[in-house]
Amino acid sequence: MARREEAKEFEERVVTINRVAKVVKGGRRFRFTALVVVGDKNGRVGFGTGKAQEVPEAIKKAVEAAKKDLVVVPRVEGTTPHTITGRFSSGSVFMKPAAPGTGVIAGGPVRAVLELAGITDILSKSLGSNTPINMVRATINGLKNLKNAEDVAKLRGKSVEELYN
């Protein structure tokens, strides 16, 4: 019973499934890799990769890996607290807060991460490498580096009101 409740805690989204081959003496051996993003649409999101000989098994492995590495995303009224650029390898993702009602303006893998993080209004642009894994990692990197006003005030030893004056 506990296993079913845990499954409902996070929503899963398969970003890519890729067939990879190992060349051996007798020919090629095929396997599948899966890139999956999981999130609760309430500020927690993670991604994982899995590899197996069958697609469902690869997805299952990826989901387990994603649940082990969750990131908490600070949100302000359904968007990010400030503009940020996430970078990974040669790919970068620029994310900018948007007014309520704008929606998620993002492409493919970036959209999956932002929606499952619970962000409802944001503008984003992916630059450089457009490999799905690089885009997902760059997005997660950017979300990890977000700071809300309370965190900044605490770091500076001031109150939130003092920051805005």
UniProtKB/Swiss-Prot annotation:
Q: Does the keyword Secreted apply?
A: no
Can you give the residue ranges of the S5 DRBM domain?
Answer: 10-73
Instruction: Give the family, as the similarity comment puts it.
Output: Belongs to the universal ribosomal protein uS5 family.
Q: How does it assemble?
A: Part of the 30S ribosomal subunit. Contacts proteins S4 and S8.
Task: Let me see what the UniProt entry remarks about domains.
Answer: The N-terminal domain interacts with the head of the 30S subunit; the C-terminal domain interacts with the body and contacts protein S4. The interaction surface between S4 and S5 is involved in control of translational fidelity.
The source's domain of life comes to Bacteria
Q: Which Gene3D superfamilies match?
A: 3.30.160.20, 3.30.230.10
Q: Return any one Pfam family short name.
A: Ribosomal_S5
Q: Which gene encodes it?
A: rpsE
Q: Which GO terms describe its molecular function?
A: rRNA binding; structural constituent of ribosome
GO cellular component terms, alphabetically, are: small ribosomal subunit
Physiological role: With S4 and S12 plays an important role in translational accuracy. Located at the back of the 30S subunit body where it stabilizes the conformation of the head with respect to the body.
Key words, A-Z: Ribonucleoprotein, Ribosomal protein, RNA-binding, rRNA-binding
According to UniProt, the name of this protein is: Small ribosomal subunit protein uS5
Which GO biological process entries does UniProt record here? Answer: translation
The reply on keyword rRNA-binding is yes
